[in-house]
Amino acid sequence: WSQNLPILGWLFLKGRAKCCGNKILPRYFLVELFTGLIFAWACYAFTQNQDLGMLLASCSFAWLMIGVVAVDTETMLIPDRFSLGGACLGFVLSLYFPSLHGVIHHPMGIEKILGAFQSLLGILIGSGLLYWIGALAGRAFRREALGEGDVKLLGCVGAFCGWKGAVFSIFGGAVFGCIFLFLLFLFQKIKPAQSSAQDNLAFGKEIPFGPYLALAGMGYFFGLREWIDPWFSWMHALGF
């Protein structure tokens, strides 16, 4: 059983399977480590003010997004259990814990309704906006530019982060993706011998967008919100 302990099992086995000696890819260790760090931070941050709703929501959102990063990077597919299931979970959590969207108290006692409304708005605006971006890009390039999984994933992000977090994730994900691809392209130019022909970047090659959307959503949820939200203050006049 000790070999199956998260993080420690990989270290005890020194990155190799005990039965055959084959190498265990470091990504499993990194996923476990990153998940553990996020959960530990959430426990520390939200138990201080006894906000158990935010603790549950933050751990759930982190688990979903880390799963998307790991799966989409390897398979270029985002399972519906992460995207659609995550959107449903985010909506339910927003209904029971409206503080997820900053709704603490309302004179009319409709905090839960407002929390659910913000979540639903995030789902519709996030997935709808990305759908039309993908549709227009598909027309322009005459090929599929975005997969349906990305559209559904942004609905999940919107359910947890609201419409502002969903909009930020589109553009933040694009920035993160461009930075990563630039660094990867630079590495391939500097050390071409260490880059396989299959992994080399080329114009028209499909790359997963889901991981960058997920990372941008996590960035917003776990710290960037207070810097991003003021940029949308002009929308308050429209009732959002």
What are these regions (language model features)?
Residues 31-38, 83-90, 153, 157, ...:
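Core segments of transmembrane alpha-helices
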Residues 16, 104-112, 191-201:
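Membrane-interfacial, low-structure loops and terminal tails that flank and connect transmembrane helices
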Residues 42-46, 96, 140, 187, ...:
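Helix-loop junctions at the membrane-solvent interface of multi-pass transporters
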Residues 54, 60-185, 229-240:
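Functional transmembrane core segments of multi-pass inner-membrane proteins
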